[in-house]
Amino acid sequence: MTEKIAVLGAGSWGSILAGVLDENKNEVWLWTNKESQAKELNENHTNEHYIPGHKYSETIKATTNLKEAVDGASAVLFVVPTKVIRLVAQQLVEVLKELGQKPLIIHASKGLELGSHKRISEVIEEEIPSEYRKDVVVLSGPSHAEEVARKDITLITAACENLDSAKKVQSLFMNDYLRIYTNKDVIGVETGAAFKNVIAIGVGALHGLGYGDDAKAALMTRGLAEISRLGVAFGADPLTFIGLSGVGDLIVTCTSVHSRNWRAGNQLGKGKALDEVIQDMGMVIEGINTCKAAYELAQQKNIEMPITEAIYNVLYNGKDIKDEISLLMQREGKEEIK
């Protein structure tokens, strides 16, 4: 049965997920706050700033009118930058009140809210009371929009405490190149999704400095240990971190030239200033803000996260990357598994 799905956010991932939903025989409305982007998608069926050369289905409808996008939708998918999640949720709840709708909410954004350090599902649940929505489901895992656009094989996770809602999202997105697994551990899935971006900056920096595979593998492995420690402290299942949204997402983000966070770290490793890197990228680098959140949460919980602290020192305290690497290597000997 055809369902109307509203996708909020027409960046790389949002527009490609809209394409998946359209291909799976849904009526898809793609909301953007840019008139020029909506016009390009509707008239040329392209999104050149985000996915150059990709042709979108002519049946996807783009709009800057949130009410038009959401009216009659059985599900609403958030794929907007973390910094505007709360604002968009506030706008959405007013529309839902007016329309008298109660859709399933899905989000595929990765990061934490700046300042509060809250997970994205927490922010959405705060701003959209349960009387105006069904469950909130997290869609996350090792995925690059460019590869899904080419219909490369991709596996990700739909997480919700209510597995029936996770299974609903599974059925909406799954096809012959995109496979969805379900998980009840929302905390673990969102934690892995957010904090892997921090480690990707570090791995990118190692590459920029000319370090080899050994160093990168070590940083990824010890970085995963830090992510797991922090997630478990907040109630996550440790097994989640060896799944798609944990080690899977970490691998793809730390090893691919598609990764914005890896590319940012790579440029830092080559000696570029942070401000210059941000300007050159022209897109959101979630790991920069998430690093600050991870560092502050680790301090609050008294959790040892030396790699995160080193990356924080480079990003926020202007420390030299090579000096931070030396300090990490000079730490006293430790047991690996503890």
Curated annotation (Swiss-Prot):
Class of the enzyme per the UniProt entry, highest EC level: oxidoreductase
Catalytic activity: sn-glycerol 3-phosphate + NAD(+) = dihydroxyacetone phosphate + NADH + H(+); sn-glycerol 3-phosphate + NADP(+) = dihydroxyacetone phosphate + NADPH + H(+)
InterPro entries, per the entry: 6-PGluconate_DH-like_C_sf, 6PGD_dom2, G3P_DH_NAD-dep, G3P_DH_NAD-dep_C, G3P_DH_NAD-dep_N, NAD(P)-bd_dom_sf
Entry annotated with the keyword NADP: yes
Keyword rRNA-binding among record annotations: no
Main location: cytoplasm
Keywords, sorted A to Z: Cytoplasm, Lipid biosynthesis, Lipid metabolism, NAD, NADP, Nucleotide-binding, Oxidoreductase, Phospholipid biosynthesis, Phospholipid metabolism
Catalytic center residues: 196 (proton acceptor)
Cellular compartment(s): Cytoplasm
GO terms for cellular component: cytosol
Classification via Gene3D superfamilies: N-(1-d-carboxylethyl)-l-norvaline Dehydrogenase, domain 2 (1.10.1040.10), NAD(P)-binding Rossmann-like Domain (3.40.50.720)
Record-listed E.C. numbers: 1.1.1.94
Residue numbers binding NADPH: 12-13, 34, 110, 145, 260, 284, 286
GO molecular function: glycerol-3-phosphate dehydrogenase [NAD(P)+] activity; NAD binding
Lineage: superkingdom: Bacteria
Pathway participation: Membrane lipid metabolism; glycerophospholipid metabolism
GO biological process, any: glycerophospholipid metabolic process
Binding site for sn-glycerol 3-phosphate: 110, 141, 143, 196, 249, 259-261
Entry similarity comment: Belongs to the NAD-dependent glycerol-3-phosphate dehydrogenase family.
Xref: PANTHER family: GLYCEROL-3-PHOSPHATE DEHYDROGENASE, GLYCEROL-3-PHOSPHATE DEHYDROGENASE [NAD(+)] 2, CHLOROPLASTIC
Function comment: Catalyzes the reduction of the glycolytic intermediate dihydroxyacetone phosphate (DHAP) to sn-glycerol 3-phosphate (G3P), the key precursor for phospholipid synthesis.
Protein name: Glycerol-3-phosphate dehydrogenase [NAD(P)+]
Organism: Ligilactobacillus salivarius (strain UCC118)
Gene (UniProt): gpsA
